[in-house]
Amino acid sequence: MTATLLDGKATAAEIKDELRVRVKALAERGVTPGLGTVLVGADPGSQAYVNGKHRDCAEVGVASLRRELPADASQEQVDAVLADLNADPACHGYIVQLPLPDHLDTQRVLELIDPEKDADGLHPVNLGRLVLGYPGPLPCTPRGIVELLRRHDVALRGARVAVVGRGNTVGRPLGLLLTRRSENATVTLCHTGTLDLSAHTRAADIVIVAAGVPGLLTPDMITPGAVVVDVGITRVIGPDGKGRYTGDVDPGVTEVAGALVPMPGGVGPMTRAMLLTNVVERAERG
């Protein structure tokens, strides 16, 4: 058996096509969705991520609002930029690129984001809304995972799902999304304190790995035919001395799984598509 690859790039492209239509409809009402980014410092990796987000914006017709500050920007300067974006009617959502320089209070910065303009869907208020089942921006990566599975006709209702990783960005909110009545999956949230991890993953129809541990999920840890989602991304140094990114799923899993969301080309493009979706939805709400 060789796993069917669930292509996040192709699915994200379909979503962008749909967003273009929605953005055009907004334009007919005189509304242009706007995504803001706040970048402090000149870290090449962070700059690349931000540039990618703005390329995505250009592809679907979303306006870009870039706010860039030097690495030595004060807390007050950063706070002022966030206050400006919170008040700007042209900004329907924005993100603060992490990590921030050490002298800045990251938690303070993130909590200053207007929850209605929280494009990442990770503001404490919006996570609380998710817990309570209230509408609000959804966390991009978990939402992207659910959307990718749904669009590939992976049955979620009644499915046994093992989520490996309890981070606030993926694992915890993903469990909340999957247990909504619209999905109705049964979720086991595994983590570093889980005893006999393999017992939980082998019992699952769907295994989603977001632990940041290269090659954590091996072929013997899943039931043949299971759906596997690789969310992990870790930079490792290969035998040639060159750096490369690898996921949490051992390559041999492709010979056992029924379907695989790979890394790269799986969850990453979906996360970016969901960021745009959150912004467009905010613009549609007015």
Curated annotation (Swiss-Prot):
The gene is folD2. Belongs to the tetrahydrofolate dehydrogenase/cyclohydrolase family. Signal peptide: none annotated. The keyword Protease does not apply. GO terms for biological process: L-histidine biosynthetic process; methionine biosynthetic process; purine nucleotide biosynthetic process; tetrahydrofolate interconversion. NADP(+) binds at G165, R166, G167, T192, I233. NCBIfam families: PRK14193.1. Its EC number is 1.5.1.5, 3.5.4.9. This is Bifunctional protein FolD 2. It comes from the Bacteria. One of its GO terms (molecular function) is methenyltetrahydrofolate cyclohydrolase activity. The keyword Amino-acid biosynthesis applies. Keywords: Amino-acid biosynthesis, Histidine biosynthesis, Hydrolase, Methionine biosynthesis, Multifunctional enzyme, NADP, One-carbon metabolism, Oxidoreductase, Purine biosynthesis. It holds the Pfam family THF_DHG_CYH_C.
